[in-house]
Amino acid sequence: MTAKICIVIKSFENQRSGLLLNTRKIGLPKKQTLYTVLRSPHIDKKSREQFEMRIHKQLLVIETETHKLREKLNWLKLHDLLGVQVKIIFYYQTRLDKVCKS
């Protein structure tokens, strides 16, 4: 039986996902926020500074056999990415159920 692992990666920098073989990489839309701050607290309203924050998102899909699921999960735990928020979703199929999501 097959299982599918979906990994959502969020980071401030564009990440390389070349660390996994047999994966599909799907680019998700970037979120861009712009902040404008006054430079001086009292006068000079025209003097402002602008800051920008970009959040890059990617979706990685790994299809594997259910008996190799533990190996893939341990591999993902060992090779963690620094400065990245990771959300992992497992889809698997059993003999009794059609499709299970956990």
Swiss-Prot record:
One of its GO terms (biological process) is translation. One of its GO terms (molecular function) is structural constituent of ribosome. Pfam families: Ribosomal_S10. GO terms for cellular component: mitochondrion; ribonucleoprotein complex; ribosome. The keyword Ribonucleoprotein applies. InterPro entries: Ribosomal_uS10, Ribosomal_uS10_dom, Ribosomal_uS10_dom_sf. It is found in: Mitochondrion. Keywords: Mitochondrion, Ribonucleoprotein, Ribosomal protein. The keyword Ribonucleoprotein applies. Belongs to the universal ribosomal protein uS10 family. This is Small ribosomal subunit protein uS10m. The gene is RPS10.
